[in-house]
């Protein structure tokens, strides 16, 4: 097991508790709890993740060595996001492999949250942009999940 996996195994329960508490403001500006039903188990799962808004969509990133994103491989999949203690519903779509769509959205995400760049082995330049060299094969290292929020969330 990688050190990073151990770190997140310890941190995730703490973050779930914090994000559901009245002290959520310490982290909820850019960390959400993604909730979804497992395709095979039909159990509810929750995983804390960094998030970024892009228009009316929410962007989530993951590395290939995690498993949660494998539930979204076939088609848009219903999910819930807890953002600032408010539950938002939407449909999650997985994007993987090399594509301009994935690269541009990963670059947008990391420009908003540069602290996450090291997780995905991306270096940032002095202007705060991901370096071209480290973005070259980003689709081989990073999974992008785009959550299209339901219209009812705006009510």
For every predicted segment, state its role.
Residues 1, 152-155:
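Basic/polar N-terminal segments that are highly enriched at the extreme N-terminus
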Residues 1-24:
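Extreme N-terminal tail/first-helix region
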Residues 16-31, 119-123, 143:
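Low-complexity, charge- and small-residue-enriched intrinsically disordered regions
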Residues 18-20, 46-47, 131-133:
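A generic local structural motif
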Residues 23-26, 40-43, 137:
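Short secondary-structure boundary/capping segments within folded domains
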Residues 27-29, 44, 74, 140:
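Short, solvent-exposed coil/turn segments
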Residues 29-64:
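Short beta-strand segments
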Residues 64-153:
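Short, structured beta-strand-loop surface elements
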């Amino acid at each position: 097991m990688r050190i990073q996996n151990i770190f997140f195994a310890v941190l995730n329960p703490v973050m779930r508790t914090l994000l559901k508490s009245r002290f959520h403001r310490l982290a909820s500006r850019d960390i959400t709890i993604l909730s979804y039903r497992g395709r095979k188990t039909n159990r509810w799962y929750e995983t804390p993740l960094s998030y970024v808004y892009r228009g009316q969509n929410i962007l989530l990133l993951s590395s290939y060595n995690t498993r949660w994103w494998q539930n979204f491989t076939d088609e848009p999949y219903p999910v819930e996001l807890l953002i600032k203690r408010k539950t938002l519903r939407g449909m999650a779509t997985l994007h993987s492999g090399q594509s301009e769509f994935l690269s541009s959205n990963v670059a947008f995400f990391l420009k908003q949250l540069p602290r996450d760049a090291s997780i995905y082995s991306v270096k940032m330049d002095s202007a705060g942009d991901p370096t071209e060299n480290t973005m070259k094969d980003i689709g081989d290292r990073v999974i992008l999940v785009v959550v299209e929020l339901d219209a009812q969330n705006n009510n």
